[in-house]
């Protein structure tokens, strides 16, 4: 809702279709040696990307393999096919770092364009 009126939702993908697309994309492009799984959570205009990652430190400490779920990225829908990409800071807050199309934002996460997303 902007300026007290309704805003037309003209996203190309939305709802379950968008979630299925993102889950398929993240599993295809983000799974690596230290990333076992990914999960998408949608809430309002935000899409959160989580990853289950290998915890080297805890594994050495306990002698058992330890995997933790981490916040990787947040996509905030602006309008049309425009999103704002944010990373999760060590302070526990989200920080915006890029705006662009859904594909551009996902590519930035995949390539770790700013060195902000895959820090574990």
Functional labels for PLM-detected ranges:
Residues 77-120:
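Short, compact, well-ordered microdomains
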Residues 5-6, 45, 64, 80, ...:
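Intrinsically disordered, low-complexity regions
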Residues 50-84:
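Short, conserved beta-strand/beta-arch hydrophobic-aromatic motifs that form part
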Residues 8, 65, 92-95:
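Short, charged/polar micro-motifs that form catalytic or ligand-binding hotspots
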Residues 1-61:
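Negatively charged, low-complexity tracts enriched in Asp/Glu with abundant Ser/Thr
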Residues 36, 43-47, 71, 81-83, ...:
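Generic structural motif recognizing short loop/turn segments at the entrances and edges of beta-strands
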